[in-house]
Regions:
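Active-site phosphate/pyrophosphate- and oxyanion-stabilizing loops and adjacent acidic/basic residues
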Residues: 1
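Carbohydrate-interacting/catalytic domains
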Residues: 5-12, 16-135
Length: 135
């Protein structure tokens, strides 16, 4: 998620989108797993690519760091009034985040999950090793 949210071109190592894992030579250059790709992971990367393609803020928006605490990080990309916020939890415990938000709800563009906004603040609890892209 972070790779697709930062400025610049997202670049994946060969096979990452299909679940190929890196090993030592000679196994690190094996054939692509055509027909046995990790379908959920491939769909995840496809959704990320579509989101980046349709959100101008992810392609060319200004970057601003909103929060960095423990394993949690939240960044904002903004362009022409379009705002996209990526919030991640790289920690091994749930992370409670509060982010300023100017709409009645915040929606995760990856899953469609909606988060309630109270008094201009979105309140999220991110599970370990998880994240959202809020629009």
């Amino acid at each position: 998620m972070l790779l697709y949210s930062f400025p610049g071109s997202p670049t994946l190592f060969y096979g990452d989108e299909a679940g190929v894992q890196g090993f030592e030579d000679p196994l690190n250059r094996g054939a692509f797993p055509w027909g046995s790709e990790d379908a959920a992971l491939t769909d995840f990367f496809r959704t990320l690519g579509q989101l980046r393609r349709t959100r101008e803020s992810l392609r060319s928006g200004a970057l601003r760091y909103l929060l960095a605490r423990g394993g949690a990080l939240a960044i904002e990309r903004e362009c022409g009034g379009e705002r996209t916020v990526t919030a991640l939890n790289a920690g091994d415990a749930p992370a409670d985040l509060t982010l300023a938000w100017d709409a009645p709800t915040a929606q995760d563009a990856m899953t469609g999950q909606r988060f309630l906004v109270i008094d201009g603040k979105a309140h999220l609890t991110l599970p370990p090793l998880n994240g959202v892209i809020l629009v």
